[in-house]
Amino acid sequence: MSLPPLTLTRRLLPLGLVFLAAGLSLALVGPFLALFLSTSVDAGPVKVTVFLVVGPLAGVATSWAIGRVSDRRPMRRHLLIIASIAGVIGCGLAAVIRDYWALLALTTTAFAVAGALFPQTFAYAREVLQRDDPGRAALGISALRTVFSLAYVGGPPIAALLLSHGGFTAVFATAAVMYALATLVAFGWLSEVEAPAAPEGDQPPPVPAPAASRIRIWLTVAAFTLMQAPMVLGVQALALFIEHDLHGSVGDAGLILGLCAALEIPLMLGLGLLTRRISVRALILAGSACGVIYSAIVFGAPAVWVLLAAQIVNALYIASVSSLGITYVQDMMPAEPGRATTLFTNTFPIGQIMAGPLLGLAQHTDYRWAYAMNFVMCLLGVLLLLATRPAARVSTLRLRRARASGADVPAGDRRPA
């Protein structure tokens, strides 16, 4: 039976604090990592590039391994604690270490383990929501994703303030404190989500939702990767495109990015509410189509004001893919929330790696062509999602009755997922 809304809100409150702390940690460090390496560590362009590629790859591999283990037994709370402690260790050491190779070792160990905090917290939230209020699972995930976005709104300005007063030592030390807060919340406030209790008496066991086929899962992951890369490339190329092609200023780029971020947050919540009336798949397809439209608009934009006007389309694209994509992949793998969430969250660092060489290609041609490449990637992503139409599934009620009586399931009871 579903819990009252207030009880469920209280249940998600500690998860919201974990997301806020983890989000602030990443938002403090991430935007200034290249600056840290080039100024405080004296790393050259090649070393910076290697660091920025090896770090995400190590995070992807570690999160994947932890995601597979996490679904085998009730241990997700312990994994949240371990990942948070790894973040404390990584940021604490980075506050004082200035040797490139030592930092590279840190990013492939402690920071890679800390990266599992994001997907594992979403997986924990999924288990709680599915147990307590399945009808609001997508809304709950969207709300938590919004908290993470809020952290990224406040994180960079806080980091800039810390840099001006205490340098990178203060930045990494503050990030370590945030991870410590996440550790305390996970240790003292969260409980392990146990497996569903066995039914009593002659009641038939609940019928688990079938997982999607392996090919459909991997095609869906490929689609989301193709739609994450344009988000990164679009941001990386924006200031350069505005300055070189539209003859605007860096301030114009900041205004556009700020407007988009401000629109994303209410849109994430609104899309979460819409999932109670419209399927997650339909909303994601519509949002992905917005990515195609936005890329086309920017490619043909004659002035900065066109980009400003198009941010509502861009925000719809980012909000739908970023917030609902997690729920969509989790729905495809209902028995493996940890692995499902990790599969989705890993699409972002892979998209980051893809965006780097594409930006270099745009530098040798024209920055406008970065958005032509975004158009192609978004279009391919939409086509892949359309190609992965869910297979027919069996009516759950009729399936239970048929299993209880030992009869075959009528073909007429099969319906699209």
Model-predicted segments: where are they?
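Helix-to-loop junctions at the C-terminal end of transmembrane segments
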Residues: A61-M75, L163, L267-V280, Q363
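Structural signature of the two symmetry-related core transmembrane helices
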Residues: H78-G92, A173-A176, A282-I297, F375
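Intracellular juxtamembrane helix-capping segments at the cytosolic ends
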Residues: G115-R131, S320-M333
